[in-house]
Amino acid sequence: MSICIKDQIQNMNIVIGCTVGCAYCYARNNVKRWHMIDDFADPDFFPGKLKMMEKKRPQNFLLTGMSDLSGWKPEWRDEVFAKIRENPQHQFLFLTKRPDLLDFDTDLENAWFGVTVTRKAELWRIDALRKNVRAKHYHVTFEPLFDDPGTVDLSGINWIVVGTMTGAQRRKIHTEPEWAWSLTDQAHTLGIPVFMKEDLVSIIGDENMIQEMPEEFNKVLEVQRSWQK
């Protein structure tokens, strides 16, 4: 049976708000519904949440579930990176749709930097990520897939996630199973783990789901389970 990625990776919304302006943005709708900040297009930083990183029980954290890394002020990023360095028991993920706006180096061993790609025309984001963010770990999220991305240069990428449209617009967008399988085959050829999100079950079948995590994430989950015994 397929698993939900949210059971493996916890959101930590240190920054809320995004300047990208995607039409299908679930985060913007949630912020408006719950009145989290005044203006979603003007991101806010919540440094008090950094204390969550001090927990000893290891976690895999996504830090950009309600933001885009390109919209973080450099001083916010520096403060978060410093806290990440102090807490090697966790793994931390970042995502951006605008890697062209980033330019930094980091030697953090437990930080993963990724881009979202929804269509072939956005493949440039992968190259921009490798060029502009000089880091130890890279990942790519192909979600929601609007068309066939074709042949993808995944060199240097350590993990990919594949998914389709969810929520109210899910009936308007149809991801073909061949697109997901093509990405999976390309990644596996390079030894890259693939995680198919649970929303693909209706498209490719639960028995065909591939849900692989990087070894670093698996180690965190193993320690979590040992703490629960």
Language-model region placement:
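Short capping loops/turns at secondary-structure boundaries
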Residues: T118, E122, I173-E176
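Conserved Radical SAM active-site core
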Residues: M1-W112, K120-R134, P149-L154
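Hydrophobic faces of well-ordered beta-strands that scaffold small-molecule active sites
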Residues: F61-L63, F92-F94, A111-V115, Y138-F142, ...
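Active-site-proximal loop/turn and secondary-structure-junction residues that shape catalytic pockets
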Residues: S67, R98-D100, V117-R119, P144-F146, ...
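Structural alpha-beta junctions
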Residues: E86-F92, R134-H137, T184-V194
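Nucleic-acid endo/exonuclease domains
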Residues: W72, F142, E176-P177
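Auxiliary Fe-S-binding modules of radical SAM enzymes
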Residues: M1-I9, F146, T151-K229
